[in-house]
Swiss-Prot record:
Name of the protein in its database record: Large ribosomal subunit protein uL24
Family: Belongs to the universal ribosomal protein uL24 family.
GO biological process, one term: translation
InterPro entries per record: KOW (IPR005824), Rib_uL2_dom2 (IPR014722), Ribosomal_uL24 (IPR003256), Ribosomal_uL24_CS (IPR005825), Ribosomal_uL24_KOW (IPR041988), Translation_prot_SH3-like_sf (IPR008991)
GO cellular component: ribonucleoprotein complex; ribosome
Length: 58
Protein backbone atom coordinates (compact mmCIF):
# COMPACT_ATOMS: atom_id res chain seq x y z
CA UNK A 1 0.00 0.00 0.00
CA UNK A 2 2.96 2.34 -0.39
CA UNK A 3 1.57 4.02 -3.50
CA UNK A 4 -2.12 3.86 -2.57
CA UNK A 5 -3.27 7.13 -1.07
CA UNK A 6 -5.80 5.96 1.51
CA UNK A 7 -6.09 8.24 4.50
CA UNK A 8 -8.15 8.59 7.64
CA UNK A 9 -11.61 9.96 6.88
CA UNK A 10 -11.88 8.68 3.28
CA UNK A 11 -15.28 7.13 2.50
CA UNK A 12 -14.87 3.56 1.23
CA UNK A 13 -17.14 0.66 0.24
CA UNK A 14 -16.45 -2.98 1.14
CA UNK A 15 -16.46 -5.15 -1.99
CA UNK A 16 -15.91 -8.62 -0.48
CA UNK A 17 -16.57 -10.64 2.65
CA UNK A 18 -19.25 -10.65 5.31
CA UNK A 19 -19.70 -6.86 5.20
CA UNK A 20 -19.90 -6.60 1.38
CA UNK A 21 -21.70 -3.43 0.29
CA UNK A 22 -21.14 -1.59 3.58
CA UNK A 23 -19.86 1.97 3.31
CA UNK A 24 -18.06 3.96 5.95
CA UNK A 25 -15.16 6.28 6.68
CA UNK A 26 -11.68 4.95 7.38
CA UNK A 27 -10.76 5.38 11.04
CA UNK A 28 -7.28 3.79 10.89
CA UNK A 29 -4.80 2.80 8.17
CA UNK A 30 -2.50 -0.19 8.85
CA UNK A 31 0.10 0.19 6.10
CA UNK A 32 2.38 -2.60 7.36
CA UNK A 33 -0.51 -5.09 7.04
CA UNK A 34 -2.08 -3.45 3.95
CA UNK A 35 -5.40 -3.03 5.76
CA UNK A 36 -7.76 -0.29 6.85
CA UNK A 37 -10.22 -0.14 9.76
CA UNK A 38 -13.67 1.12 8.76
CA UNK A 39 -16.14 2.74 11.15
CA UNK A 40 -19.26 0.67 11.77
CA UNK A 41 -17.69 -2.69 10.97
CA UNK A 42 -17.04 -4.86 13.99
CA UNK A 43 -13.56 -6.24 14.36
CA UNK A 44 -13.70 -7.42 17.99
CA UNK A 45 -12.75 -11.02 18.56
CA UNK A 46 -14.15 -13.26 21.28
CA UNK A 47 -11.74 -14.56 23.93
CA UNK A 48 -12.38 -18.21 24.79
CA UNK A 49 -11.78 -19.36 28.37
CA UNK A 50 -8.64 -21.39 29.07
CA UNK A 51 -7.01 -22.87 32.14
CA UNK A 52 -5.25 -19.56 32.91
CA UNK A 53 -8.11 -17.30 31.80
CA UNK A 54 -11.36 -18.59 33.32
CA UNK A 55 -13.33 -15.50 32.31
CA UNK A 56 -14.45 -15.38 28.70
CA UNK A 57 -15.60 -12.19 27.06
CA UNK A 58 -15.44 -9.78 24.23
Amino acid sequence: MDKVKFKKGDLVKVIAGKHKGTEGPIIRVLREKSRVVIEGITNIKHVKPSQDNTEAGI
